[in-house]
């Protein structure tokens, strides 16, 4: 039980959306709830999960468990991203631009939840295309996953980090 308590303290969770869905059967409609949850440690690890159940708390619990199984590590430089990037998923895309210290997180709804829980404190973002919460979350995570720091770019180009900036 002690390990579970440590894990609970390590990650912060944020419910992005809760949706009531219906299955139409002969006798009428059967309602269930879906939950979209983002979890992160504010130190560069973030993930999302979805859960479905007949009760809201149970759906949230399932979503949190799913999110903890699929965490992404984010490259950060002084509280922002190393470079501008566009994350895409389906017909939704999210533009992420690094910002100067003190700018804060300029993002809407689902994108804000992902960025804050990833530990990014200064960033500009713009949601383009589809604004479905799950598409926005996945597009944001796609962008964050594809970020490269200066060392990785230098290695890909066969140069030193100093040569990149000159």
Swiss-Prot record:
Residues 11-74 form the S5 DRBM domain. It holds the Pfam family Ribosomal_S5. One of its GO terms (cellular component) is small ribosomal subunit. PROSITE patterns: RIBOSOMAL_S5, S5_DSRBD. The keyword RNA-binding applies. One of its GO terms (molecular function) is structural constituent of ribosome. Keywords: Ribonucleoprotein, Ribosomal protein, RNA-binding, rRNA-binding. One of its GO terms (biological process) is translation. The keyword Ribonucleoprotein applies. Belongs to the universal ribosomal protein uS5 family. PANTHER family: MITOCHONDRIAL RIBOSOMAL PROTEIN S5 (PTHR48277:SF1). NCBIfam families: rpsE_bact (TIGR01021). With S4 and S12 plays an important role in translational accuracy. The N-terminal domain interacts with the head of the 30S subunit; the C-terminal domain interacts with the body and contacts protein S4. The interaction surface between S4 and S5 is involved in control of translational fidelity. Part of the 30S ribosomal subunit. Contacts proteins S4 and S8. This is Small ribosomal subunit protein uS5. It comes from Staphylococcus carnosus (strain TM300).
């Amino acid at each position: 039980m002690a390990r579970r308590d440590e894990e609970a303290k390590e990650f912060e969770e944020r419910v992005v959306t809760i949706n009531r869905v219906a299955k139409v059967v002969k006798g009428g409609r059967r309602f269930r709830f879906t939950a979209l949850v983002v979890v992160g440690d504010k130190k560069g690890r973030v993930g999302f999960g979805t859960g479905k159940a007949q009760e809201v708390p149970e759906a949230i619990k399932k979503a949190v468990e799913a999110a903890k199984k699929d965490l992404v590590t984010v490259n950060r430089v002084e509280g922002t991203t190393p470079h501008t990037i566009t994350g895409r998923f389906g017909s939704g895309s999210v533009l992420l631009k690094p910002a100067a210290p003190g700018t804060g997180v300029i993002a809407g709804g689902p994108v804000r939840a992902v960025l804050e829980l990833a530990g990014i404190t200064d960033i500009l973002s713009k949601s383009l295309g589809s604004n479905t919460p799950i598409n926005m979350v996945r597009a944001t995570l796609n962008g964050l996953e594809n970020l490269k720091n200066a060392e990785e770019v230098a290695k890909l180009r066969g140069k030193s980090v100093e040569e990149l900036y000159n």
